[in-house]
Swiss-Prot record:
Signal peptide segment: none
Cross-referenced Pfam families: DMRL_synthase
The family this protein is said to belong to: Belongs to the DMRL synthase family.
Active site (record annotation): H87
Keyword hit for Secreted: no
Name used for this protein in its record: 6,7-dimethyl-8-ribityllumazine synthase
Keywords noted in UniProt: Riboflavin biosynthesis, Transferase
Gene Ontology CC terms, in alphabetical order: cytosol; riboflavin synthase complex
A GO MF label: 6,7-dimethyl-8-ribityllumazine synthase activity
HAMAP family in the record: Lumazine_synth (MF_00178)
One GO biological process term: riboflavin biosynthetic process
Length: 170
């Protein structure tokens, strides 16, 4: 099991906002992941969660970028299942690169909860279903919120928030 050894934890994200972008493709896998991501946000005491739907994985990065402008953390959810053509590889490379670019350019963490699996069964096994071995929706949400808190702490320590100098009082 690839999830062996992963930490089970939540964070106190009270006051943080979370943007979630989820695909419509492979709904039987994505919907439970979305439910679990929202449950994680609630347990972490997120102040506000916005959910946006897109067609597929290639559309995720541009919407994640827009969410990053108004949220403390973003989560991307979807499932790309390998087919008989190289399209799978192009899609996976495209959205993965896009999500990394969004996080680096906006300085807002993006939790990657987009499954890239050879089979639907592999995706179901990671979707947080009652019989799943893993819970990638939950994990992606907590990871994004945790990273947002780490960034906030680092920025506060040097007198900055959101990458901008904070005003000093005299």
């Amino acid at each position: 099991m690839s999830g062996a050894g992963r930490p089970e934890y939540t964070v106190d994200a009270q006051g943080l906002t979370l943007g979630v972008v989820a695909t419509r493709w492979n709904a039987e896998v994505v919907e439970p992941m979305l439910e679990r991501a929202l449950a994680a946000a609630e347990q972490c005491k997120v102040a506000e969660t916005t959910v946006v739907r897109v067609a597929g994985a290639v559309e995720i990065p541009v919407v994640a970028q827009e969410l990053a402008r108004t949220h403390d953390a973003v989560v991307a959810l979807g499932a790309v299942i390998r087919g008989d053509t190289p399209h799978f590889d192009y899609v996976c490379q495209s959205f993965t690169h896009g999500l990394t670019e969004v996080a680096l350019r906006t300085e807002v963490p993006v939790g990657n909860g987009v499954l890239t699996c050879d089979t639907l069964e592999q995706a179901r096994d990671r979707a947080g279903l009652p019989d799943s071995k893993e819970d990638k929706g939950w994990e992606a949400a907590v990871a994004a919120l945790d990273t947002a808190l780490v960034l906030r702490k680092l920025r506060d320590a040097r007198g900055q928030r959101d990458g901008r100098p904070r005003p000093t009082t005299t």
